[in-house]
Amino acid sequence: MSRFAEVIVVARDAEEVMEPLTRPDADREWHQCFTRVDDSVFAGTGTGSAECYLWVIQFTRHNWRGLLAHLEALPWPDPRSVQVLVHDEEDDCFGLWMIYDGRLTEVPLPHTVRRLHPDVSVTGTLSRTDRG
């Protein structure tokens, strides 16, 4: 099934934890790799600092079911800084997941509702309730 989904991971001091996810790994449930986004993108300098807080990935197939559980299980140096933003093809906006009590948990966003559709989407669809 062809379907687009974008995932952004924001986390402090997580370069070592995220680095393996920037390389192909046949043992993972998904095959795409995260791309590191360092501060050179924002500064326009072409060279970034050693610290990176942001990684992005786009899925073009419905093949990333294990991603959120995998991210939850990583040994994050600062779990309170971890934010995972997910935008599925049918979503009105990005959904936000954060680690609470060791679990990657969706944070309810104002004026949104998530409808689960396991046969269509990994996370369901996130719709704005304030649309006209």
Give residue spans per PLM region.
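An N-terminal amphipathic alpha-helical segment
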Residues: 19-46
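Charged interaction segments
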Residues: 43-132
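Short linear motifs in intrinsically disordered/low-complexity regions
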Residues: 14, 26-28, 39-40, 71, ...
